[in-house]
């Protein structure tokens, strides 16, 4: 299990920066509003250790009474989401309910994992969804250029096995990209810049954590 405190941010989009040698490096900009600590869970009271945070804003009319009570107890403003990070005893030191966690949690050159919700593509065929090769363009092939082809064997087993790769819904699922390097940490603007691409559409929420494969 990933036992490390992280941050919840928002994907701003991609750009590029140039190194001193003039090499173009593709980067993604992540805006990180202060993560407000709403609850600290301990082994004694909850059976596990975690730091629960919220970020952003939410209209009061969109907040349930249970959520209002939870945020009020912590003394923080209601956020657009709530996220927990499982942590060790050492990482709980200095953390208190009502406090904040910012981009200074990370340093330039640190390797991180970024989790987000991938872009939804809707219902897609086997060629796009699973990288199947297409059938013959000619030689007697009619209206079957992108169809799957055979999906089973013969009378035995006489069925299609579960999990067979077929056309279906693509994207809109939780995806983690591992091993991304932090290129810049801007504490004034509360912005992280990481090397490479991260999952999701512009404006989507992402979770940034120290890499699990250190």
UniProtKB/Swiss-Prot annotation:
GO function terms (MF aspect): rRNA binding; structural constituent of ribosome
Any one GO cellular component localisation term in the record: cytosolic large ribosomal subunit
Keywords per UniProt: Methylation, Ribonucleoprotein, Ribosomal protein, RNA-binding, rRNA-binding
Pfam families reported in the protein's UniProt record: Ribosomal_L3 (PF00297)
Modified residues (N5-methylglutamine): 155
Post-translational modification: Methylated by PrmB.
Keyword Ribonucleoprotein among record annotations: yes
Any one of the GO BP annotations: translation
NCBIfam families, sorted: L3_bact
Function: One of the primary rRNA binding proteins, it binds directly near the 3'-end of the 23S rRNA, where it nucleates assembly of the 50S subunit.
Subunit and interaction comment: Part of the 50S ribosomal subunit. Forms a cluster with proteins L14 and L19.
Protein family membership: Belongs to the universal ribosomal protein uL3 family.
Protein name: Large ribosomal subunit protein uL3
Organism, scientific name: Acinetobacter baumannii (strain ACICU)
Organism lineage: Bacteria, Pseudomonadati, Pseudomonadota, Gammaproteobacteria, Moraxellales
Gene label: rplC
